[in-house]
């Protein structure tokens, strides 16, 4: 696939203490914002230009006001497409997810432990560098699963890290990985090639109808490291159209666990295993039989 090469963004700048960064990231993720840079006394958040309007701005202010008691001042600036690689490479270091996984920058050498699985990532603006707790939680859950014969779909693939990890954990079937952001889909294609893994199909899919058409092809495991609002919308869809599939999800805050339990009960899923890190959780769920 060949997504567009030019992707303009809106940069939101929050001048806050660094000890609040993780909390702000958690809160802003509920608005579907997944791309951040941390600077001294300033948190930068990025979203596609096409998603920014007065309604989105007011929604963010309302969420911050409800969370913190007041809406902190932030600025919004237009950012033309540029060399995001240089931006990210200035901040990224290798990330040891566990004794099994090491995420590194592409084309750089690191000391690797025996039997450690290395994933090389060129993140650009895509989500899934290993720096966010949700990515680490998903990978730790995946380590414990027998993926060899699973037919896997990765929803909101970002950098493609989860699809790549599934292949490196021994999955033998074609994997479908898709995102609704053009730069993310493009980035995932690059990372799949960088890691020399075969049979990972990366697609730019924006409409729910396209997802449903693919779900009907009989997937065994759905990977969904996305935000609460999207999960609320698509989990019932997955339940209807992939009635036998397990779902491994993250992007849910710990304090939203009651919401998740209520949703799973309503759509007839059982929770197999939940793990936690910081303010985040990851849950492996499956249909009740």
UniProtKB/Swiss-Prot annotation:
**Could you state one GO cellular component term attached to this entry?**
cytoplasm
> Using the chain's own numbering, where are the disulfide bonds?
none
EC id: 2.1.1.-
State the Gene Ontology terms under molecular function.
Answer: protein-lysine N-methyltransferase activity
Q: Which domain of life is it from?
A: Bacteria
GO BP: methylation
- Give the keywords, sorted: Cytoplasm, Methyltransferase, S-adenosyl-L-methionine, Transferase
Cited Pfam families: PrmA
Catalysis: reaction(s)? L-lysyl-[protein] + 3 S-adenosyl-L-methionine = N(6),N(6),N(6)-trimethyl-L-lysyl-[protein] + 3 S-adenosyl-L-homocysteine + 3 H(+)
Q: Which residues bind S-adenosyl-L-methionine?
A: 135, 156, 179, 225
Q: Per its UniProt record, what HAMAP family does this chain match?
A: Methyltr_PrmA
Q: What is this protein called?
A: Ribosomal protein L11 methyltransferase
Organism annotation: Chlorobaculum parvum (strain DSM 263 / NCIMB 8327) (Chlorobium vibrioforme subsp. thiosulfatophilum)
